[in-house]
Amino acid sequence: MTSPSPSGNVVVVGTDGTSSVSDRWPPQKTWISPPRVPIDRHFVTAAVPHVLMFLLVCIVFTAQQTRISTLEKRIDQLVVQIDQLPSSDSNTDDDDVAKSRRVRNSCMCPAGPPGERGPVGPPGLRGSPGWPGLPGLPAPYYRRPRVPLSNNLDESISRKMRAFGMLYSPDGQAIQLRGMPGPPGPAGPKGLRGYPGFPGPIGLDGPRGLPGTPGSKGDRGERGPLGPPGFPGPKGDRGVMTGPYVGPHAGPGPMSHHTNMGNVLPGPPGPPGPPGPAGRDGRHGLKGDRGLPGFDGESKIGPKGETGSPGRDGIPGARGPPGERGEKGDTAFLSTYPRVASSSTASSPGPPGPPGPPGVCHASQCTGIQGPPGEPGRTIIGPQGPPGEKGERGERGEPGDRGLPGAAGAANLLNGGKALVGPPGPPGRDGRPGDKGEKGEQGLRGDMGLPGPEGTPGKRGRRGRHGISLVAPNGTINEDLKKLLKTELMPLLIEDISELRGKNVIPGPPGPPGPRGHHGPVGPSGERGPQGLPGHSGERGDRGDIGPPGLPGQPGAGEISGSQSGPRGPPGLPGPPGEKGDLGPPGLPGQPGSLGLPGPPGPMGLRGPHGTEGETGKQGPEGSKGYPGPMGPQGPPGNDGEPGIDGRPGPAGEKGDQGIPGLDAPCPTGPDGLPLPYCSWKPMDGKNDVWERRKRASLPGAQPGKGAETRPPVTD
């Protein structure tokens, strides 16, 4: 029931007594929405992974069952073809029985009319092989002689069997299925060290450091600029009038000002005028007074440290050049020193004289080396002359060669004993490190080490990328793959095989079969092959099932009267079997199978050998000579050293007077009554020979460090 409303809407009253307002007529039917069921989100999130896993398992199981059923069909077809082949051990009785059956079942009636074309049969067998592949490389070993196949198996059938993964014996009596792949072989040797990887990413920023110590209080700043003008002050008090008030209307008019200016008194100041315009910014103020001194800050200078350990002794300075030779002393007299009365021994040298003046100090070392002793003078040894005056400082000479050790000290020579060996000096400073030597040659590869422990299995690898298909979508061989094989794979294979030919290589056992590759895309249907030869007639099979009813036969020969049809005639005899049809085109290849699960990772390889110790690197270049250090303080005088080797001979002295030959002189005399030269007490030719000097020094009565030069006895 409806009733109009004042607003133009229609009030709809339902059969159940409910009323509603609608702006249309007839009112639209309201659909009753089903009640909402609350859904638990946690339940949904927990159930979705399980449902997806169940669907995935179902899909995998269905795919496996499909593959198994497809293989079973193919095997059944192969079994049928094998059964159709003639058997060599067939008996003649079976042939007779088959012949009788054919005669019995043959129809003697005339052939009926040809029947209609039957339905399309099932897809045929696999087509002929495709295009021949690229020529393979020759094997590095001798090929085994090929066993001729039996006549029982056709070449095409055997090829198909091999394509399906079956093997057959050479005599054709046994068919073997390919077994399951064996376990993975042992891991190969460890490969070479790879190239260094890419540099890693920049590391994260380190933690924030601790806050530093607060700084000291700064100096007081300069005085700031002058501030803006202040607000106007409050209104002042009213002033006090001291004279008569003259208002604005007090005078008679403006003429009074001109007539008598002296009698008019100024009035009080008026009210403040309006504020004037803002003034300009003032100048900067003067610098303020200096602030009070700040507090003392924390001292950054720590306490005085402890006394350090004493430093090492300085390196001894270089040896200085020899000093200048002094002037020759005065001739000595016999009255100064006692004479030697013995005629069997040579005269001994006199006591040492007083020390001479210090030598000239050079920049490198103030103490000069001791000069070599001069040759003996006259027999009469005079006293030491007075020291000469100090000469002027000469120019610095070039450093000479290292001299031989000097003679022993005077004190030890007088006592006749050997000099004491002084204590060893302090160790010298460590030398500067030399420059870095050149990089040594790479060491030889070490022997193979012991096998390490078996490692834990690695993680599952990532799924590989899809490879390049051998067959292009148009049914031909992929051109990119051809180019890849010719340009990259073929040169590598030829090089490896050429290397193998040059060596006595024994082929190893065949490796385990690799994983099954991806199925290529579906190729186009090949051309129809030529019709095959008729096969051998097989044995009679079992009775088949009852076939479908045949087609209606032709009308009988009876007359038809009126519109009535005659009785139905008996069914006609079956016609003879038709000729075998042509071989159908090859069926399309099946769908590619799903990728198999990756196999378990192989065991960890053996531990590689330890490398041998590398060769010693080449010696680096000798470092540059250091600069001479500053001259250290003069050390204490050391003990007298051992007598050294004789120094170089000094300059030749003045020739002495000829002595009187001895009474026991073995030398012959010359025409002048004197001994021949180079005889008796005169020096020998081997004076400068070291061996000769040592020999003369070993004679009794010889002076240490001097040659065994005999002198004639001194007589009165």
UniProtKB/Swiss-Prot annotation:
Keyword Iron among UniProt keywords: no
UniProt keyword terms in alphabetical order: Collagen, Cuticle, Disulfide bond, Glycoprotein, Repeat, Signal
Keyword Zinc-finger set for record: no
GO biological process, one term: axon guidance
Region Triple-helical region: start-end pairs: 179-238, 265-298, 302-330, 385-411, 422-467, 507-557, 566-603, 605-664
Membrane-crossing residue ranges in chain numbering: none
CC terms in the record's Gene Ontology section: collagen trimer; collagen type IV trimer; extracellular matrix; extracellular space; neuromuscular junction; plasma membrane
GO MF annotations in UniProt: extracellular matrix structural constituent conferring tensile strength; structural constituent of cuticle
Segments of skewed composition (Basic and acidic residues): 280-290, 389-401, 429-444
Glycosylation sites: 474
Compositionally biased spans, kind Low complexity: 402-422
UniProt protein name: Putative cuticle collagen 99
Source species of the chain: Caenorhabditis elegans
Name of the gene this protein is made from: col-99
